[in-house]
Amino acid sequence: MPKYRSATTTHGRNMAGARALWRATGMTDADFGKPIIAVVNSFTQFVPGHVHLRDLGKLVAEQIEASGGVAKEFNTIAVDDGIAMGHGGMLYSLPSRELIADSVEYMVNAHCADAMVCISNCDKITPGMLMAALRLNIPAIFVSGGPMEAGKTKLSDQIIKLDLIDAMIQGANPKVSDEDSNQIERSACPTCGSCSGMFTANSMNCLTEALGLSQPGNGSLLATHADRKALFLNAGKRIVELTKRYYEQNDDSALPRSIATKAAFENAMMLDIAMGGSTNTVLHLLAAAQEGEVDFTMADIDRLSRQIPHLCKVAPSTQKYHMEDVHRAGGVIGILGELDRAGLLNRQVKNVLGLDLLQTLNQYDVMQTVDESVKEMYSAGPAGIRTTQAFSQDCRWPSLDTDRVEGCIRDIEHAYSRDGGLAVLFGNLAIDGCIVKTAGVDEGSLTFRGPAKVYESQEDAVDAILGGKVVAGDVVVIRYEGPKGGPGMQEMLYPTTYLKSVGLGKSCALITDGRFSGGTSGLSIGHVSPEAANGGLIGLVQDGDIIDIDIPLRKIRLDVDERILATRKEVEFARGDKSWTPKARERQVSLALRAYASLATSADKGAVRDKSKLGG
C-alpha cells in the first residue's frame, strides 16, 4: 500500500517545524491525516486564455476540502504566444514549457503533495503541466479555462466570423482600409478564453481529453459559459476519489501513466489528425510520451497519419467553423465517436472518470447518448458579449449539429478528405522528418516544386515578403530557428500570415526548422529535423536550389547533386567554431536561452532535453 507522500511533512516529532508552518497556512490537527492536493493554477493578466482563472482555483479547492482533502494552490507562468509573436519574445515560448514542467515538479515534490488538479489553457501551459503530471505520476486531473467565443463583425453588409489570425492578415493587407482593419482588430478576440480556432491551445486541451486526463467537454465548452463551472467543481471532487483509490486501496489505475498509455496516445494522435490540429501538438505529445516513458515516436505519428481521414475542419482551415461549432457538434467525444464507428480507435483505455472508451461514447457521444443533460451541455453556445468573466452567460444553440454529411464533424464516408489533417514528410532535407498541417493546404499545392529563397531569421524573411522579394513559385526557407539554433524554436506565424497578406498564400511554400502557430495554414512545413544547428541539410540550402514537396507521397527533397552538397558541407565545417550557425544574424540571446539551447534536441524528439548530456 503506497504511503501518502504528504505524511513525510505532517507526521512524526521530527516534522514539528513543518507542521508549524502548515498550521500558519490554515491547517489544523484534523488536516494532518488528509491528502494534500496541489491546485496548479496558471492565472495571469497577460493572457486572455488565463485572465479569468484567478477565482477558479478557489472553486476547485473548496470541492477538494468538502470531499475530505486539503487543497493548496500555486501558480505557474504563462506566455501568450500571440503577444510574444513577431519579436524576440517568441524565443521564450517553447522553453517556457520546460520551465512550467520543472516548476510544477519543484513545488509538488518540495511540499510532498499527494495529487494535483491542473488548471491550464494556452499553448505551452497545458503541455508543460502534462509533462509534469506524467513525470511525477501522482493522481492528476486537467481542467482548462476553455475556448474564446469567435469574433463577429459586419463587413460589406455581411456578418462574418473572425479570430486573431484574421486581424493579423488583414492588418498587413494593403488592400484593406484602415477603418475595416480597425473594425476587424476590435472584433477578433471578444472574450476571455483560448483563441477560438483549432490553434495550439485548443488542440492540446482536446488531446488532454482524448488522453483521458480531463473530463468530456473540457476541450470545447466555451470559457464564458455557465456549464463550464461543473467541470471545475467535479474536478475537485473527483481528484479526492482518485487520490484515496491510489493511496488507500493500492489502485494504480488512478495514476496518469495508467490512463495515458500507448493506446491512449495513439487515440489522441488519431483525434489530432482527424481534426487537423496544430502541428505543435506533435512536439508536445512526443515530449509528454517521453516523460511518461511511453514508446510513442514520429514513426507512430507517420503510421497513423496515413490511416486517419480528416473529419473536422475548423479555423484557421476554414472560417465557417470555430470551437463553439465543434462543441455544438459533440466536441472531442463526437469526433472520437466517428473514429470508433470506423473501427479505428483503441478501445482498451480509460479516463479520469473511470470510464472506458465504450462507456464514454455511450454516455457522451451526441449521436448515441440518451442522456438529456449531456445533450444540453453540448448545446452550450456563445452570447456575443465582450467579457473577461468565466461562466458569465448561459446561451444555448437551438439545436445540436448532428449532420455528419455536411456539418462541422463528418462521418468517415463524408470526410473532408481521405488524408488526415497532419502529415509527416521524409527526405534528404528532413531525414528525421518534418510536419505539415495538410488540413490547411490548398488541394492544388499538395505537390510543389520551386526555387529556394533562404533566410536565417524570421525577421529577414518577413522583410523580404513585405518588401516584394518573394514571388509566386518560391520556396521560402527559414533556418537556424530550431530548438537549438533559434534558440527556442520560434513560431513562423508572421511569415505565413504575410504571404497571405501579399497574395502569395497559395503560390508559395515555406519550410523551416522552426515551428508554426496553430493559426498557420497554407503550404507551411515545419519541425525540419535535424535542424540546421545540428548539421541538418537545411543548413546547406542556397538561393535558387530546387526543392520538391510531395505530400501524398510524404516526401520532401532538395534537388541538388550529392557531390555539390558534400562540397558545401566541407565548406561549412571549415568555419570551425562558427560552423552550423547563422552567417549574418544579430540576435541577443540571454543566458537562460543559452542554457535551454545547450540541452535541446531537435523537433523529432519533441524538443525536450538531451538526457545523455546530463549524465546519470
Curated annotation (Swiss-Prot):
What Pfam families does the annotation carry?
A: ILV_EDD_C, ILVD_EDD_N
Q: Pathway, according to UniProt?
A: Amino-acid biosynthesis; L-isoleucine biosynthesis; L-isoleucine from 2-oxobutanoate: step 3/4; Amino-acid biosynthesis; L-valine biosynthesis; L-valine from pyruvate: step 3/4
Q: Does the keyword Nucleotide-binding apply?
A: no
Tell me, what is one Gene Ontology molecular-function annotation carried by this entry? magnesium ion binding
Under InterPro entries, the record lists: Dihydro-acid_dehy_C, DihydroxyA_deHydtase, DiOHA_6PGluconate_deHydtase_CS, ILV_EDD_C, ILV_EDD_N, IlvD/EDD_N
Catalytic residue positions: S517 (proton acceptor)
Q: Which residues form the signal peptide?
A: none
Catalytic reactions of this protein: (2R)-2,3-dihydroxy-3-methylbutanoate = 3-methyl-2-oxobutanoate + H2O; (2R,3R)-2,3-dihydroxy-3-methylpentanoate = (S)-3-methyl-2-oxopentanoate + H2O
Which PANTHER family does the record associate with it?
Answer: D-XYLONATE DEHYDRATASE, D-XYLONATE DEHYDRATASE YAGF-RELATED
- Family label: Belongs to the IlvD/Edd family.
Protein name per its UniProtKB record: Dihydroxy-acid dehydratase
What gene is it encoded by? ilvD
